């Protein structure tokens, strides 16, 4: 990209064996003696992304460098590969790549880099075999010839301020512990999802208790342990469970939480992948333009979106454009957005289906799909014939959504 060409650390021209090569790596923010164990992540990746998006960042881009961690179809000899990369200006890969022959050696390097000054922020080590498959068969997340070994997660003892209950998109009651806010690595943590009511009761968490909190994948806080409990227990009574996987497709006052959870899900990457739309935006849209059902936003006009508090004219136009683009998503994405209980392994076999074909399937036909047993087949038939789901399918048909 044009912005990448402004980064001084990136060579403008590659010659020799590197000419026309594809390199894989990551931009990083140069640090002076960064000790991961002490300083944590420092939100470094977000800072890099911010610099790459700034219009006036030409000078600041000199703070960036690149770590090349793969050269598909490059020289098979690792020493020669690292030498060629270093000659081209990619010095860090060679400095931080070492041969190992045992898990003990891997552990030693991991501990050393975790506790020693480095010129960048890191979150673990990559262990890879000496040989790699041809580049044409590489697939993200599916390389059996390499593995990541993350550093121990940062953790803190944090006190519980309150316990509250929320309803997820499946209708299940979730327990959230509100915490005294603290910095954990590069994040400000003030709440943690405990999980189901049964898990909360098993952990016996009350107001005033102290929890060991760490960051799981993607920086999500998690409860590792209860380290101290108050002598006098303060635990609220959970509300009665009155929602399920087929409730709250339509908005009502008592459905507000599950309805919002459904909106958050359908806009996520796992469903319709609506760019730039999340929980906060759904809240303000629902307050300004109350939606009847989970797909009512498709009928919003540019003017209605621009009238939402906090949304500028330009952003309103952009949102309307994103909503309009979603109309072209494949049929399977729409039924996922509705919450169809299909196992991941069976999705590929539904890509050529439409709503009428799905609704016509019997329990016996559903059981022929991977991962679908007697209970799941019964759930699928119930889902496809539920009056609210049928009404949504009819509405989407009126909107000319593919497959309906």
Language-model features, listed with the residues they occupy:
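Extended, well-ordered alpha-helical scaffold/bundle regions in very large, multi-domain proteins
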Residues: 357-365
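Extracellular/lumenal glycan-associated surfaces
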Residues: 346, 353-355
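RNA/tRNA-interacting regions in translation and RNA-turnover enzymes
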Residues: 1-329, 336-342, 351, 366-399, ...
